[in-house]
Amino acid sequence: MNSIHRDIFKAIHEGKWLKIEYLNKEGRHTNYWIGIRDLDPWNKTLKVDGLHLNRCSIAGYDKIYIDSILSTEIVEGSYCPENERLIEDIALHPERYQNLFANTANLKILNYLEMCSKLDATPYTTDYELVRYIDGDQVRDGEYQLSEEQFKEIVTNFQRRMNRGTQQGKTLHIQKLALNILSIHTKNGLYVLAYRNLNLDVKNKAFKPDEDITICTQFTIGGEQENIRRYLDADEYELLSDFEKNLEKIKDAITEKNGARAVVDDMPYVIGLGMDCALNLHEEYKAILDMYEKEQVTFPIRAFFGDLLERPRRTKAYPIALLNQNINLDQLLAINNAMKYPLAYIQGPPGTGKTNTILNTIVTAFFNNMTVLFASYNNVPINNVFEKLSSLTYKGKRVAFPVLRLGNQEKVKECICYINQLRREVHGIKVFSSTLDRRKGDRIDRAKQLSGRLKEYEEVLDLTERKETLTQVMEYQERMKNVATLFHFHTDLQGRQLRNLDEKIQKIGEISERDAMALLDRNEDEFYSYLYYTSAKYIKELESNRFQDLRKILDDDEDVNEQAAAFNKYLQKSENVKKLQKVFPIMITTCISSHKLGEPEPLFDMTIMDEASQCNVAVSLVPIIRGEKLMLVGDPQQLKPVILLDELTNRKLRRKYHVADEYDYRENSIYKTYLACDAVSDEILLRNHYRCNKKIIDFNNKKYYNSKLQVQSDSRERQPLVYVNVDGGPGDMKNTSPAEVEEIMRYAGENPDKSIAVITPFVNQRILIERGIKENGFEHVVCGTVHAFQGDEKDVVLFSTALSDRTGKGTYDWLKNNKELINVATSRAKDKLILLADGKELERLHQGNEDDDLYELVQYVKMNGESKITEKHISSRALGIQPFSTETEAAFMKNLTHALENIWLTRNKYTIHKEVAISQVFHD
């Protein structure tokens, strides 16, 4: 599908006008805006309303030939009535439109994600010149009629804005008109909480407000971000979900809580809003459609769209190279699968050696001459990996490991300095290629043996899971009535099938870590020698003639800003990226900055994404496009992506494009989407936990990880769980407990030798605690919400719940089953978890509710880890199949049992078929 067809598809579905350059019958080029009324796919013609841009006149055209359209661009901020019949016909009969819109299902998903990404930004008020044309009081009746002069001025303004947008390239600065519904006058400026978009109805020469209201839970004022949670308590936050119905309640709540500090304003005036989107995904996503057009789709992209129906069979065994011997079987299996297969999903619960697995995967890829793009949504995980790779040493000297840390302008400046530093360091190192790896043949032979053992280990895990499932099926059957009809089947399960599984497991035998480690190269000194000299060889390549153009950039440091700009320009070309990989085969950057690496095409052998469960779906595709293979590392039980797109807008976009649940931008991370869409690739669980005292992590293990974690930590703390009951008394402010702050300061003062983290779910409580830390001068104590501590660890964690007599049901409902918050907060503690709460208020809020994770955690800590923990239903391959705990699974078991009864009672022969087309099952 070319870009013209794609823009036509988008204009039809989004109800927008399209700017076109058209070759008319006389052979002249003319420029129009067109509003599409209908489409004839057979004759490839459009029925449109057209605005002639030179004359600014509007007329109807019944036959615009699509093949005569030379270029197109969506007119953002315009309104065209949607042809619902046409949209439905495209959805129901895509084959009719195949010559125009190939892969319509994929196109809908990409258009949806592109729109979500554009709108997932913090808005701000801006001096938009169109505001002066409109009086908000006149928009009350549904639209604002424009005079001929106003209309011409506005069309000219739209044209100028579109031209600027074309020149801006990959960065988007969106400006739009909006009709105020509710704003808050704060001391810093105007916070626009709710508005309706005003769109240009070109045909009627009027501005038309959206039917739907947009809610801004976050807004930028004077460069500082404001959040609605500052003006509404959690109890009242839910009122936003039905804004129109609850408008008066919202106004009253803001006024009651904030008084004169925040004055609400519901006057219907017109405002200019701006949004800065770091990346325009249009060209990135076009590359995906081009892959399908050319039939050169990579495995990761096929898996994303659910097109991977069979796991590729790979027989090659890759030698595994390790930086250290701190490795276990699960980590080895993760590395092996990442090397061997096009997709590998690694679930890394807290403290299971996720970073170590990534480091060894990167080094193994380097050892096997692979290129790697390592990315994540934020800087912390990629900085950690870069720091470790760039600080490797051999006999007291730094290993010039060929890795680049790229990113924004400052990171690029640092990168240039780093490259030049490496050039100087390797200058005097003599490298003899013949001695770099004398034992390569031995390594390959060992790799084959290790690959075989890991395959057996994977098979044992699979057989064990099957055995668990078989046991669960039998337990289900025993609970059924009329089980006599299934007696023979039940006996077969209990006897032959269960025995077969046991025999297979016994035949393979136990796969120990000692067996696997024996097949690894244990000569660490020799391997670091290899890394030292091989890395130097890579860096020395920079001095060859082929890099003369790059050296010119690296050596010209007169203006570091111009130098960085020149280096960025160099990296924009795919041929330069491929050339640079000969020196730096490993490149590290954020998901957003990945777009700076060449064109959107497969440039790397492998993309590795860390914290994939925190990466949003739309932007994550940018680094994924650039890799032939993909390794996603994350944990869906920890923090989710931070999404600003409001729920109402998301629902509207999903309806518009008929987007399935697995691609829901607000509800999914890239990790969750891939697991939902790829049914054939394995997910590996890193089961060995090394961080927390056993009693601390046991709560998380039983609650969130199906008791799959094996605790290997060496903490010997005798009292790892401490509950502090704090009588908070009447509070002056919601979501604060000064009494808990006092207890925290007392403990911190008595334990200056401990690294301490204080985690609280509430901003107001955090402010009080931070004030106390500053006043007491505690340098060993840090405080924050859970997002500040993802991936971190401390000797002691104090969890301040800050429940008080002013805490309402809505606030507690948000807190009690916030699994990401509770899981991350508790699993940061290595030796001691101290939980502070007002027991009286906790009992009041709990109200005997069975489903309450926070209450269970308090009881667990109170009883020193001896209380009962109810498991959360987790949809995860890596954590094993949950036994029929959903309606869908129960219905499946009921239908399966019914089918088996028929088979056993009728004694008919039967066969099992996989991947049967629905058309063969249901006949007309």
Regions found by a protein language model. Name each.
Residues 1-88:
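Core beta-strand-centered patch of the WYL/Sm-like small regulatory domain
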Residues 28, 905-924:
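Active-site metal-binding core of divalent-cation-utilizing nuclease and nuclease-like domains
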Residues 82-222, 490-491, 497-500, 509, ...:
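A helicase ATPase "motif cassette" and its flanking acidic/Ser/Thr-rich regulatory loops
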Residues 89-92, 96-102, 133, 288-298, ...:
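Conserved P-loop NTPase motor core of helicases/translocases
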Residues 188, 192-337, 412-430, 434-436, ...:
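Pre-P-loop entry segment of helicase/translocase ATPase cores
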Residues 208-211, 215-252, 310-427, 565-705:
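ASCE P-loop NTPase helicase motor core
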Residues 646-684, 701, 773-775, 808-913:
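Helicase C-terminal subdomain and adjacent C-terminal extension
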Residues 707-772:
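Conserved helicase/translocase motor-coupling segment
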